[in-house]
Amino acid sequence: MKAISSRTIVLASLVGFAVGGKIYTLNECVRGEGFYDSFNFENITDPTHGRVTYVNRTTAESLNLTYATSDTFILRADDTTVLGVNDTGRNSVRIRSNRWYHEHVVVFDIQHMPEGCGTWPAIWETKESDWPASGEIDILEGANNVVPNQSTLHTSHNCSMSNHTHQTGTFLTTNCDASVAYNVGCGVQHTRDNNSFGPGFNRIGGGWYAMERTLHYIKVWFWERDDPCVPLDVRTGAWIIDTEHWGIPAANFRNSTECDIRSHFGANNIIIDLTFCGDWAGNPAIYNASGCPLDCVTYVNNNPSAFTNAYFQISSMTVYE
């Protein structure tokens, strides 16, 4: 499908502000072909050692791995090619925002996310050239269709979270230090909602992910498409939002004597990608526990049709500051 239109709205006349870390104004709204203007395609070797080849924009468009309508952006992987043992990996896409972000709120309206054994989709923030010193925030991430979603921080030394925090999710680990335990980070599972990831997410038509980063905390919310509790300012993409009325977040990473958010997070980009296997999805213990067949690389190499549903369909990304 040929990309036919775009709309990127940057509200330069609105100077973003926050009152008490709760009230924000719209700074950027990205839809459709606007993703081409707001993001770079990263034609790089996968730092997570996935069975993937990240292609540039020209290749992505020619292979139909990205395309857009007036209100939708698609990012997907190849689903036709059987890979040989000497091939570098399945063609896919990794995009990085042109802008850097400090304190902000970002909201993603997502209709569909990649699913399938061997898949490892993610929407996250980091500064690649200064990782982990500038921190990493994984907003949406998972592997091999295993539910629910997991939101995770990865940092430099001396950052741990308290288990006693006001959130609906459950901490799997509390030490965010990337040098500890093979970089598992401090992860929170969205245990209240198995539709927050994978096939269940897609069956309900997706929903909204939001992340708020301040000097004192980082919060992540998820609302299903038909959730009556979706805040009106989220559902409508309002010019002004008030996170105070968004309810209890799924993940709530807070300042403490064990971690100073300000000193562990710098100016970061937003990254959206889809890899296969690699350090997480391809870990034999994790892959086998997910109930997926064969080993990860063999499966990904030989079953291209299994990845027909391995795509992001994103309606919009809105940023508030």
Residue ranges and their predicted role:
Residues 3-20:
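Cleavable N-terminal signal peptides of Sec/SRP-targeted secreted and luminal proteins
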Residues 3, 21-321:
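GH16 jelly-roll
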